[in-house]
Amino acid sequence: MKDLYVVNCCRTAIGSFGGSLKNTPAAEMGAIVVKEALKRANVAPENVDELMFGCILTAAQGQNVARQVSIKAGIPYSVPAYTVGMVCGSGMKSVIEGARSILAGDSDIVVCGGTENMSAAPFASLDARWGARMGDKKLVDTMIKDGLWDAYNNYHMGTTAENINDIWGITRREQDEFAAASQQKACAARDSGRFDDEIVAVPVKVKKEIVEFKRDEYVKEGVTADSIAKLKGAFPVGPESPNPQVVHTFEVTGAQDAADKGTQRVTAANASGINDGAAAIVLASGEAVAKYGLKPMAKLIGWGQGGVDPKIMGVGPVVASRNAMKKAGVTIDDIDLVEANEAFAAQSIAVARELHFDMSKVNVNGGAIALGHPVGASGARIIVTLLHEMQQRPEAKKGLATLCIGGGMGTAVVFEKC
């Protein structure tokens, strides 16, 4: 197999829903990170062979968001670009597709990543074109419908997390402790400047001034498990408990401890946020690295995907990570750092149990519960965060990034530091 390298990567700071990035189009955010990633990689735009970029909420964003990103970033018209739509896995899927393009001999340098402005997702009238003659009409929230709603069981992603709670026996207290730890780690990392190297500033208008947005704004100070313990459950418990063994064999550890089985345990505090942001990754072949004298951050040594019952979509990373590690020829004991996207504390805990994570290596600077989850960008964002953290830790040689995907899927990638 050809050698595959991440030459450089970066991300925006993550904005809150309706926050600092609400008026910055997804394509604009994407262009900013692509331009900066190419600059850091010392790759001329004309040497890019293709751009592939994740974006889920594309309604009213204009044709092919990835092409907009490419042109706005100064990449020549002659370079093709396409938008990847694999729900939360879109940003990571773009990296997998970039790797495949290089392995196939179609490309030597590709730009991958993802962008999402959840704040800008429009409301839609589904019958206005042909049937809205008179009377009140319903508007559909495309942010929920296209990004956060299980199309197969007709309920919110939060209910899939409640399904996992019941099957894996995860308590409300466990989830609140997990969420509080994420917030505390993210606060410490942000305030100490741990994220500074991976973030590129985005100019935003505040009143009449243009200021640089470069600090993750969704992170909450002072969160403890006790401080969020009284929040009410946010999502209905699923009408039925699916059998996790239908597609794959899971250990389902802890199920015997389901003291609060059937109760609502997923809250606004132990679930990820609704957010805006973008991330970009420059991927190159070994030949391109040698030809242009590039200095890569890491080698991509394996990736994996997988599917599970949509009712328990949050455990998709278990299957994907096993496949990725098998392809890379490593075990979990070989992995020094893990970035596992925190869609919900429930699924994060289940994934950690099934994969036997050493939690001291997982999301060491917090995860999506604290930082936020701009859905089309998150798969790329966790790669950016993982690789930059590996650079700061001499002992970190190998890293795993993985995330769950609505509809019952997962993706994962394994890197080795250069």
Please identify what each model-predicted range represents.
Residues T24, C55-V110, Y152-T159, G222, ...:
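Conserved catalytic cysteine-centered active-site region
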Residues T160-E162, V206, I301-A370:
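Active-site pocket-lining segment
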Residues C10-T12, K22-I32, R40, E174-G286, ...:
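N-terminal extracellular/periplasmic Venus flytrap/periplasmic-binding protein-like
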